[in-house]
């Protein structure tokens, strides 16, 4: 097991280039199964979750090469419609192959998914969508099987704007007969990126990024070249780190529109955020005179749940009382216990966390409970007095490419060591 050892009280200064978005790359990789042509993707981050997805695709018949951020995929035929348990148990997003498999072969069988243990995250929305398109769903011991000779377009209403369900149903519908309408669809930028990718292959999708997506089914899709959008959550993590450490960081390769709610909150707290449109970059700095905040996580375009933990690490040392309300996932305050071990004063009441700003945090031995909690503890370690050890950093490796290397480039004193 590896851990990060962090020496505190280090300002982050300099420039950092943001990687491609994991949450855009994963559904796009799954979507590559929809064509027998060659798919070439650039700006794919080198992360454990990406490698897991590539293993799933290989098991289904894809020929894959991956080097220096470029993936080339070719799946002339699907050799198996069953996603292997070994990979699926590691990562929930492997469930995204179900829509493409169903569309291309009429059958998909998959183990029940794993990944971060945050909340219920039910997959029933995906399954209801497939059923609406005409698939027959069978659930066995730890398995789900869907079969459909030919999917037929229909109207699907999502009870909750689930990102994964929107993506999976969209991919199933591109080869279905007739028109599919997804109502109360998720509006995340990663869905827009997936739709652009599919449309460039010959799909007919309109309305991605709005609450209603219309898909007209086509007979088949062609190969394509596509560049994955930048990772707004990685960008947000470095922006929050800059403010927390009273630093000055230029965050490069960002789409500012994707970061609107975070930028608004950082400015409200008293930080400075300046956009350089020509360079697709943001300058973020803070003199340390910050005000407490009220934050409520919401589906996009609201404040992202994936930045909630990092904001809490920042607010832990901001004078006054801040309130963070989590409405997207239950069980997403697991980092609070760890932050409190470092001297934070945070109490939880239902879905809200009340943060009483303390003068300083103290280095401690803590452990990442999930991906974003891990990033939050690293930020806390950079701010704290003394040395912090963050364990279970395999969680962090699932979503941040070369995290400690990028932080060292900004002046952080952080090392990866074997436990």
From Swiss-Prot:
Residues that coordinate or bind UDP-N-acetyl-alpha-D-glucosamine: 92, 121-125, 306, 328
Query: What's the EC number here?
Result: 2.5.1.7
List-wise, which residues carry 2-(S-cysteinyl)pyruvic acid O-phosphothioketal?
Answer: 116
Location in the cell reads: Cytoplasm
Instruction: List the active-site residues.
Output: 116
Q: Can you cite a GO biological process for this protein?
A: peptidoglycan biosynthetic process
Gene3D superfamilies reported in the protein's UniProt record = Enolpyruvate transferase domain (3.65.10.10)
| Broad class of where this protein is predominantly found | cytoplasm
Sorted alphabetically, the Gene Ontology cellular component annotations on this record are: cytoplasm
Q: What class of enzyme is it?
A: transferase
Quote the catalytic activity from the record.
Answer: phosphoenolpyruvate + UDP-N-acetyl-alpha-D-glucosamine = UDP-N-acetyl-3-O-(1-carboxyvinyl)-alpha-D-glucosamine + phosphate
Pfam families registered for this protein in UniProt:
EPSP_synthase
Specify the pathway: Cell wall biogenesis; peptidoglycan biosynthesis
Q: Which UniProt keywords apply?
A: Cell cycle, Cell division, Cell shape, Cell wall biogenesis/degradation, Cytoplasm, Peptidoglycan synthesis, Pyruvate, Transferase
Q: Which GO terms describe its molecular function?
A: UDP-N-acetylglucosamine 1-carboxyvinyltransferase activity
Q: Which residues bind phosphoenolpyruvate?
A: 22-23
Instruction: Name the family the entry cites.
Output: Belongs to the EPSP synthase family. MurA subfamily.
What does this gene product do? Cell wall formation. Adds enolpyruvyl to UDP-N-acetylglucosamine.
Q: Which PANTHER family match?
A: UDP-N-ACETYLGLUCOSAMINE 1-CARBOXYVINYLTRANSFERASE
Protein name (record): UDP-N-acetylglucosamine 1-carboxyvinyltransferase 2
- UniProt source species: Carboxydothermus hydrogenoformans (strain ATCC BAA-161 / DSM 6008 / Z-2901)
């Amino acid at each position: 097991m590896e851990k990060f050892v962090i020496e505190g009280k280090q300002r982050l200064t300099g420039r950092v280039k943001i990687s491609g978005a994991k949450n855009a790359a994963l559904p796009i990789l799954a979507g590559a199964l929809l064509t027998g042509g060659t798919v070439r993707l650039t700006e794919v981050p080198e992360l454990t979750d990406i490698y897991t997805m590539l293993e799933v695709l290989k098991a289904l018949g894809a020929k894959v090469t991956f080097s220096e951020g470029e993936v080339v995929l070719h799946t002339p035929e699907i050799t198996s419609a069953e996603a292997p348990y070994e990979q699926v148990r590691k990562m929930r997003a492997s469930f995204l192959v179900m829509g493409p498999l169903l569309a291309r072969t009429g059958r998909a069988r998959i183990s029940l998914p794993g990944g971060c243990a945050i909340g219920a995250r039910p997959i029933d929305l995906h399954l209801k969508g497939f059923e609406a398109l005409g698939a027959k769903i069978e659930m066995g011991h730890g398995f789900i099987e869907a079969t459909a000779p030919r999917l037929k377009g229909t109207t699907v209403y999502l009870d909750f704007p689930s990102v994964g369900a929107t993506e999976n149903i969209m991919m199933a519908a591109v080869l279905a007969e007739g028109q599919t309408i997804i109502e109360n669809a998720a509006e995340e930028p990663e869905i827009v990126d997936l739709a652009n990718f599919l449309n460039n292959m010959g799909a007919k999708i309109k309305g991605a990024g709005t609450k209603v997506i219309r898909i007209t089914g086509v007979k088949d899709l062609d190969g394509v070249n596509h560049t994955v959008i930048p990772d707004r959550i990685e960008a947000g993590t470095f922006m929050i780190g800059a403010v927390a450490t009273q630093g000055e960081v230029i965050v490069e390769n960002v789409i500012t529109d994707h970061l609107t709610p975070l930028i608004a909150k950082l400015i409200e707290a008293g930080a400075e955020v300046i956009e350089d449109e020509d360079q697709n970059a943001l300058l973020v700095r803070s003199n340390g005179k910050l005000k407490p905040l009220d934050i409520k996580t919401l589906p996009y375009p609201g404040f992202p749940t994936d930045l909630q933990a990092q904001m809490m690490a920042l607010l832990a040392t901001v004078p006054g009382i801040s309130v963070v309300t989590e409405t997207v996932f239950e069980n997403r305050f697991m980092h609070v216990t760890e932050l409190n071990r470092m001297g934070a004063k945070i109490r939880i009441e239902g879905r809200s966390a009340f943060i009483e700003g303390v003068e300083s945090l103290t280095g401690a031995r803590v452990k990442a409970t999930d991906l974003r909690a891990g990033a939050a503890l690293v930020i806390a370690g950079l701010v704290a007095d003394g040395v912090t050890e963050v364990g279970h950093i395999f969680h962090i490796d699932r979503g941040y490419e070369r995290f400690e290397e990028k932080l060292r480039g900004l002046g952080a004193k952080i090392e990866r060591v074997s436990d």
